[in-house]
């Protein structure tokens, strides 16, 4: 039996080399709104776009690191595209000034993974709850899952079991009232 090693989201070895270069960058809603209020929405979008591009470049470095380290699977960070699915901010990928370069870099991530035989998948954050009794939570979860699927598509991963998206249902006994047992 062959054992395939996998890496989840972040390479501590790369971060030890250069924490600033190899760390994912996020952005809070507060920071985005502060930028909008102080410098305008265009500047906030520009900063967000820059951070997303950085995250995608870091992902490319991590996939290449996996290849050099004999790691056969990489699970994408769910933080590649911060705030993009926040409905209150109404951000479209098309308005990101770096979207073309982001898409090209994501394609390169996929090309590198294929070249070195590295499988990839994703694991959306725990706040995504498909089994919620709250319709708004389910709607937001579907939006997040669609975004994650779009990223997998932009990378060029197959739409099958070889590029899994790990989704937790978050079942609790109270849900017995909601779901019919099949």
Go through each PLM region and give its residues:
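Conserved, mostly hydrophobic/aromatic
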Residues: 123
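Alpha/beta catalytic barrel-like cores
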Residues: 1-118, 128-131, 136-139, 154-157
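Eukaryote-skewed repeat-based solenoidal scaffolds used as protein-protein interaction platforms
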Residues: 139, 145-182
């Amino acid at each position: 039996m062959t054992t395939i090693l996998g890496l989840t989201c972040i390479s501590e070895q790369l971060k030890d080399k250069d924490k600033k270069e190899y760390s994912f960058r996020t952005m809070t809603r507060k920071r985005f709104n502060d930028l909008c209020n102080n410098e305008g929405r265009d500047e906030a979008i520009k900063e967000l776009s820059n951070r997303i591009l950085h995250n995608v470049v870091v992902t490319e470095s991590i996939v290449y690191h996996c290849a050099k380290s004999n790691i056969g699977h990489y699970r994408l960070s769910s933080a590649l595209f911060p705030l993009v699915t926040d409905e209150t901010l109404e951000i479209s990928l098309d308005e990101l000034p770096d979207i073309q370069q982001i898409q090209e870099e994501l394609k390169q991530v996929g090309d590198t993974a294929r070249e070195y035989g590295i499988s990839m998948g994703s694991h959306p954050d725990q706040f995504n709850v498909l089994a919620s009794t709250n319709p708004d939570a389910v709607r937001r979860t579907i939006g997040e899952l669609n975004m994650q699927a779009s990223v997998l598509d932009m990378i060029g991963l197959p739409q099958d079991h070889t590029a899994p998206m790990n989704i937790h249902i978050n079942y609790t006994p109270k849900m017995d009232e909601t779901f019919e047992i099949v």
